[in-house]
């Protein structure tokens, strides 16, 4: 029972990681295609985008999703997301154009070339959409890297803990065998034990602090849930008394 309970969170994390990888690849594929259309020079916008490794992976993921979900469903989802992204990008573009106009007037009143200085704020909806896609992809990749680094650090912590124990045992055996004087041997063993205890405290404090923080958050959620249930039960009792 304990093994199945402990393996369930790892399965959820793995599923979330796989889904996030798929989403990141799709977003980056869309961002690459969009940025090539929007930010390329005028003479190169009509050329076909160069097919790199990331674009090939994005197309493969898109074909896989078409196979799993279905081309029609995937097309409907893609069109819906495109319309939503276009509406958001258009609103942001209008806001940036208004902001650039106000800033240009203020800079012109100060004797500066306001139109030239605020040219970078005049973004089209397609350019805003490109920034949003790259930003979403960067956030997903950041989450994946954080998860991966957490797993790597956890594994390295276990390995370093075992290595620390092996080094301590080797030092203990070497001291007992090589130091003939009992007083010197006792002092060296005391120093070795003190060093081992300090290293154990320093390496274990971070993990214990993170575990304690997670437990505190879990208890806070449970307390909030109990309060909500008590309020709901009190409201139900009041309604019954009024009836």
Curated annotation (Swiss-Prot):
Ranges in the topological domain labelled Cytoplasmic: 105-135, 206-243
Compartment(s) where it occurs, according to its Swiss-Prot or TrEMBL record: Nucleus outer membrane; Endoplasmic reticulum membrane; Sarcoplasmic reticulum membrane
PTM entry text: The N-terminus is blocked.
Biological process per Gene Ontology, one example term: cellular response to gamma radiation
Protein name: Voltage-gated monoatomic cation channel TMEM109
Job description of the protein: Functions as a voltage-gated monoatomic cation channel permeable to both potassium and calcium. Plays a role in the cellular response to DNA damage.
Main localization category: nucleus
Oligomeric form and interacting partners: Homooligomer. Interacts with CRYAB; in the cellular response to DNA damage.
Tissues of expression: Widely expressed. Expressed in skeletal, cardiac and smooth muscle cells, in brain, including neuroglial cells, cerebral cortex neurons and cerebellum, but not Purkinje cells. Also detected in Paneth and Goblet cells of the small intestine (but not in the epithelium), duodenal gland, pancreas, parotid gland, testis, thyroid gland and adrenal gland, as well as in epidermis, choroid plexus, ductus epididymidis, lymphocytes, fibroblasts, endothelial cells and seminiferous epithelial cells (at protein level).
Sorted UniProt keywords: Endoplasmic reticulum, Ion channel, Ion transport, Membrane, Nucleus, Sarcoplasmic reticulum, Signal, Transmembrane, Transmembrane helix, Transport, Voltage-gated channel
Residues annotated as signal peptide: 1-33
Organism: Oryctolagus cuniculus (Rabbit)
